């Protein structure tokens, strides 16, 4: 797959940008993700988080929608989410 140059982003900024985050269904997971989202988007609405537990209840899928203002912001947000110890995958 070929990388798209930064100056040719397919995303128009600012825009509402949904991010799916999957992690262990443990106390504090939702709060940790909301805290990260708020650092990158101070207008983020914590009550807008969509939650989906796995069938067995071991994992929790979250969809957060942030206001994306730049590719750098999104890259940093993905890095921070992916690096969090409770997070298994970020899409």
Curated annotation (Swiss-Prot):
InterPro entries: UPF0250_YbeD-like, YbeD-like_sf. Coiled coil: none annotated. SUPFAM superfamilies: YbeD/HP0495-like (SSF117991). It holds the Pfam family DUF493. It comes from the Bacteria. Belongs to the UPF0250 family. This is UPF0250 protein Lcho_4239.
């Amino acid at each position: 797959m070929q990388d798209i140059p930064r100056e040719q982003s397919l995303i128009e900024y600012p825009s509402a940008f949904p991010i799916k985050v999957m992690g262990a269904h443990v106390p504090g997971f939702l709060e940790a993700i909301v805290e990260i989202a708020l650092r990158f988007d101070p207008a983020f609405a914590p009550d807008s988080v969509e939650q989906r537990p796995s069938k067995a209840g071991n994992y929790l899928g979250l969809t957060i929608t942030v206001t994306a203002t730049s590719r750098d912001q999104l890259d940093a947000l993905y890095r921070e989410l992916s690096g969090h110890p409770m997070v298994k995958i970020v899409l």
